[in-house]
């Protein structure tokens, strides 16, 4: 199991039966593959779906917000973008799982643009992180060049300020509580010294710090 799969598997443990969930593009879409037995969620997509189905149900005439072919489950609803964003902005999404370029110790998120690169816009990320009841960021702990992505202060353009509730990487789980960043779990095979060495942000260590089970 590679790093992204481990991250997706751990995030899936946070979702509750009956949740309405928005999964962002890329790594977050993998979360649906690791839902625990007995946990059923309803997937929402910004382009107007409630009740997305697994990849195996993909239809050539349907695409999700990332432009990928998708399917829908029995009872699904389809609507325009105005209704979709009313659901998001109205606080009706229980959890969103998004990727990240940078997260900092103040729960700020940068995940939509790398300076100097042309992008068509932020998409629905800003709405999701401000409107969802729980914001989970799923990303690899360091950049491809080994540099830190978990910083004292984000250096890339922000998506939202003080919006992240939980950050999951292949090395650790952090939670943002009462204005502080807390390390609550370390991955199986990792140790506190490694997490500190690869994390620029300052964080507190939970008294009941857990080590993730390898079989989760």
Curated annotation (Swiss-Prot):
One of its GO terms (molecular function) is acetate CoA-transferase activity. Keywords: Cytoplasm, Fatty acid metabolism, Lipid metabolism, Transferase. The keyword Cytoplasm applies. NCBIfam families: pcaJ_scoB_fam. It comes from Escherichia coli (strain K12). The active site is at residue 46. Disruption phenotype: Mutant lacks acetoacetyl-CoA transferase activity. PANTHER family: KETOACID-COENZYME A TRANSFERASE, SUCCINYL-COA:3-KETOACID COENZYME A TRANSFERASE SUBUNIT B-RELATED. Pathway: Lipid metabolism; short-chain fatty acid metabolism. Its EC number is 2.8.3.8. It is an enzyme of class 2 (transferase). This is Acetate CoA-transferase subunit beta. It catalyses: an acyl-CoA + acetate = a carboxylate + acetyl-CoA; acetoacetate + acetyl-CoA = acetoacetyl-CoA + acetate; butanoate + acetyl-CoA = butanoyl-CoA + acetate; acetoacetate + butanoyl-CoA = acetoacetyl-CoA + butanoate. It comes from the Bacteria. Coenzyme A transferase which is involved in short-chain fatty acid degradation and catalyzes the activation of short-chain fatty acids to their respective CoA thiolesters. During acetoacetate degradation, catalyzes the transfer of CoA from acetyl-CoA to acetoacetate by a mechanism involving a covalent enzyme-CoA compound as a reaction intermediate. Utilizes a variety of short chain acyl-CoA and carboxylic acid substrates but exhibits maximal activity with normal and 3-keto substrates.
């Amino acid at each position: 199991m590679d790093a992204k799969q481990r991250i997706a598997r751990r995030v899936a443990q946070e979702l509750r039966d009956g949740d309405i969930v928005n999964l962002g593009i890329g790594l977050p879409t993998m979360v649906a593959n690791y839902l625990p037995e007995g946990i059923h969620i309803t997937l929402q997509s910004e382009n107007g779906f409630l009740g997305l189905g697994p990849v195996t149900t993909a239809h050539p005439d349907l695409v999700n917000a990332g432009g990928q072919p998708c399917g829908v489950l029995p009872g699904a609803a389809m609507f325009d973008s105005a209704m979709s964003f009313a659901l998001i902005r109205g606080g009706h999404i229980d959890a969103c799982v998004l990727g990240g370029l940078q997260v900092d110790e103040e729960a700020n998120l940068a995940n939509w643009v790398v300076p100097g690169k042309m992008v068509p816009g932020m998409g629905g990320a800003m709405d999701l992180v401000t409107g969802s009841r729980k914001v989970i960021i799923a990303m690899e702990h360091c950049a491809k060049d080994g540099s830190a992505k978990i910083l004292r202060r984000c250096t890339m353009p922000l998506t939202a300020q003080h919006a992240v509730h939980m950050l999951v990487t292949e090395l650790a789980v952090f939670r943002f509580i009462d204005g502080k960043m807390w390390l609550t779990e370390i991955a199986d095979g990792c140790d506190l010294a490694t997490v500190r060495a690869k994390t620029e942000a300052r964080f507190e260590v939970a008294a009941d710090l857990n080590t993730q089970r390898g079989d989760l």
